[in-house]
């Protein structure tokens, strides 16, 4: 299969999600699959890194400056996904690249699955001191994101 992984967090950013995605990519390739990573730009990345990593223009997220959010290049990402003839999209975020992955899957009429990595209820207090999104709102937002997916993976029972 030709698999597109869509994530807002990938190396050189340091996180459990980035490590999980790299491990997933490695193991899928060992099984004979071709894996493309669609992720955000990063100033610390060599412009000529692995050709299977597609960087989408991004800016720092206001609440977490070390995390990034894509803001343009969506049509170009669709062209690349079409050119690479993806069979399935696997999103790894509920934010910019996750939404992009869902849109591209619909445009290409291919399945989209999602890994739910983060228990957001534990993080909303960092965004405008919890005044914008309350922990009780998270489940409704997440359900909305996941309503049209073909599958959801949770790496732990807590999440």
Regions found by a protein language model. Name each.
Residues 3, 88, 105-124, 153:
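Active-site proximal beta-strand in glycosyltransferases
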Residues 62-88, 97-103, 107, 136, ...:
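An amphipathic, basic-hydrophobic alpha-helix
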Residues 145-159:
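A short, active-site helix/loop in glycosyltransferases that binds the activated sugar's phosphate group
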Residues 92-97, 116:
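Short His-centered aromatic/hydrophobic patch
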Residues 43, 96, 158-159:
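Alpha-helix capping/helix-boundary segments
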């Amino acid at each position: 299969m030709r698999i597109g992984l869509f994530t807002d967090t990938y190396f050189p950013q340091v996180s459990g999600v980035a490590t999980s995605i790299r491990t997933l990519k490695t193991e899928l390739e060992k099984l004979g699959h071709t894996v493309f990573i669609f992720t955000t730009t990063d100033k610390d990345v060599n412009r000529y890194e692995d050709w299977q990593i597609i960087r989408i223009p991004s800016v720092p997220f206001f609440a977490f400056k070390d995390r990034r959010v894509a803001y343009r290049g969506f049509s170009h990402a669709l062209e690349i996904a079409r050119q690479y003839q993806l069979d399935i999209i696997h999103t790894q975020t509920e934010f910019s690249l996750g939404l992009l992955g869902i849109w591209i899957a619909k445009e290409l009429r291919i399945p989209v699955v999602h890994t739910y990595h983060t228990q957001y209820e534990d993080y909303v207090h960092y965004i405008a001191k919890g005044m914008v999104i309350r922990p009780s709102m998270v489940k409704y937002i997440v359900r909305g994101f996941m309503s049209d997916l073909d599958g959801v993976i949770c790496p732990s029972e807590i999440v």
